[in-house]
């Protein structure tokens, strides 16, 4: 599901004053200290939904947003649980941590005001995608692998510094061995575009998703 915001909008990810070097005085006056205002869309923000059923039903949502804080995820899980009849404890909400999403959290110190209308739009998308996935469940075989990746990412834009190079890959295939979906777990601070970027984007993980 595409979860692009209505533009223009405030951007989360580089709201500390030390990240304001790219903004003019006029931009700072319009958007507030440290908060960028998105002037366009570089690529789509997505909501990915995976439902696994083996005796019990587990739902995994991954959002292209900066932070999935508890206040937000609790509201989303409750909405999906009530709409789909699912156990709220079996609903997981995570994020890709792009630093170029709309403001969806209250910030590290409660200094931000999240876009509550955007929250509601995401909840509606979650409900729709969960209902669709429940109607289209397929038999699948699961394999779990771990690989080492070098040269494609690290922790922020710091080449040569230590980082976790392990990636776990959960692959679901049909009985004929055809791939259905892959779920990747890796440690990466996706800040490739940096604070100078004024476009909404999924950043590194958007490119990774399109390439896998």
Could you describe each region identified by the protein language model?
Residues 1-94, 102-212:
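Conserved beta-alpha junction segments in alpha/beta enzyme cores
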């Amino acid at each position: 599901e595409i979860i692009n915001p209505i533009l223009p909008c405030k951007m989360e990810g580089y709201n500390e004053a030390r990240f304001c070097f790219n903004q003019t005085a006029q931009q700072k006056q319009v958007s507030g200290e440290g908060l960028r205002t998105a002037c366009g869309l570089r690529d789509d923000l997505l909501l990915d939904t995976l439902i696994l059923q083996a005796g019990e039903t587990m739902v995994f949502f991954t959002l292209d947003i900066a932070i999935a804080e508890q206040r937000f995820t609790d509201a989303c899980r409750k909405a999906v649980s009530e709409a789909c009849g699912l156990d709220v404890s079996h609903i997981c909400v995570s994020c890709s941590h792009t630093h170029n999403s709309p403001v969806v959290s209250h910030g590290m110190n409660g200094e931000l005001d999240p876009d509550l209308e955007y929250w509601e739009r995401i909840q509606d998308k979650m409900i729709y995608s969960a209902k669709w996935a429940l109607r289209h469940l397929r038999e699948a075989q699961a394999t779990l692998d771990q690989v080492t990746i070098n040269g494609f990412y690290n922790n922020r834009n710091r080449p040569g510094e230590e980082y976790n190079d392990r990636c776990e890959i959960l692959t679901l295939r049909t009985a004929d061995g055809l791939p259905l979906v892959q779920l990747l777990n890796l440690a990466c601070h996706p800040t490739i575009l940096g604070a100078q970027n004024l476009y909404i984007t999924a950043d590194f993980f958007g490119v990774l998703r399109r390439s896998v």
